[in-house]
Amino acid sequence: MENKYSRLQISIHWLVFLLVIAAYCAMEFRGFFPRSDRPLINMIHVSCGISILVLMVVRLLLRLKYPTPPIIPKPKPMMTGLAHLGHLVIYLLFIALPVIGLVMMYNRGNPWFAFGLTMPYASEANFERVDSLKSWHETLANLGYFVIGLHAAAALAHHYFWKDNTLLRMMPRKRS
């Protein structure tokens, strides 16, 4: 068994990381841009979200298809259980967030854009649903900061404190 994830899994992991940064930055920094740029910034956010959704589903399918490389030295069962729980939360979060965002945008009942394309929208707006979905989307996005921070801290703890190969399994291979 390989001691690293596949190149595809590693590439998708880091691409999702970059897309999450872009999606978060689009929303956090949009106030620094003129209002006339908001549609473009929103389109970037939505396009990143759709890309994250697709890539997270692909990651999940790859994770089911390929065995997870072993952590060496093997951690205690409780640590393994916590890692599985953490990964479950990450997958659920970064699949649910884009789905909620897409359903929210659809229910606004007006044109919206992703990848430069006009996306389908409801013939009649449902603002009550939009408000509820927006609240969930924002709450989960804020939770995402904590989950990402915890994920990164755990990877660094594995590398520097427990001195195992957890972090190295997801790092790109060195060129020969």
Curated annotation (Swiss-Prot):
Q: Which E.C. number(s) belong to this protein?
A: 1.10.3.17
What is the free-text note on the cofactor? Binds 2 heme b (iron-protoporphyrin IX) groups per molecule.
Which cofactors are named for this entry? heme b
* InterPro entries, per the entry: Cyt_b561_bac/Ni-Hgenase, Cytochrome_b561_oxidase, Di-haem_cyt_TM
Instruction: Tell me which domain of life the UniProt entry assigns to the organism this sequence originates from.
Output: Bacteria
Q: Name one Pfam family in it.
A: Ni_hydr_CYTB
In this chain, heme b 2 is annotated as bound at 45, 137
Give the Cytoplasmic compartment stretches of this protein. 1-7, 65-77, 159-176
Recorded topology in the membrane? Multi-pass membrane protein
| Signal sequence bounds | none
Catalytic activities: a ubiquinol + 2 O2 = 2 superoxide + a ubiquinone + 2 H(+); a menaquinol + 2 O2 = 2 superoxide + a menaquinone + 2 H(+)
What keywords are assigned to this protein?
Answer: Cell inner membrane, Cell membrane, Electron transport, Heme, Iron, Membrane, Metal-binding, Oxidoreductase, Transmembrane, Transmembrane helix, Transport
| Induction pattern | Expression is 10-20-fold higher in the logarithmic phase than in the stationary phase and this pattern is not influenced by the presence or absence of oxygen.
Localization in the cell: Cell inner membrane
Q: Ranges in the Periplasmic compartment? A: 30-39, 104-135
Q: Name one GO biological process term.
A: respiratory electron transport chain
The activity regulation comment is: Quinone binding to the enzyme accelerates the reaction with superoxide.
MF terms from GO for this chain are: electron transfer activity; heme binding; metal ion binding; oxidoreductase activity
Which of this chain's residues are annotated to bind heme b 1? 13, 151
Q: Which GO terms describe its cellular component?
A: plasma membrane
* Record note on quaternary structure: Monomer.
Function per UniProt? B-type di-heme cytochrome. Catalyzes the oxidation of superoxide to molecular oxygen and transfers the extracted electrons to ubiquinone through the two hemes. Can also use menaquinone. The enzyme may be responsible for the detoxification of the superoxide anion produced in the membrane or at its surface. However, it can also efficiently catalyze the formation of superoxide from ubiquinol under physiological conditions.
Q: What else is known?
A: The low-temperature difference spectrum of cytochrome b561 shows an alpha-absorption peak at 561 nm and a minor peak at 555 nm.
Tell me its family: Belongs to the cytochrome b561 family.
NCBIfam families found in the cross-reference section: PRK11513.1
Query: What's the protein here called?
Result: Superoxide oxidase CybB
Q: What is the lineage of its organism?
A: Bacteria, Pseudomonadati, Pseudomonadota, Gammaproteobacteria, Enterobacterales
UniProt lists the gene as cybB
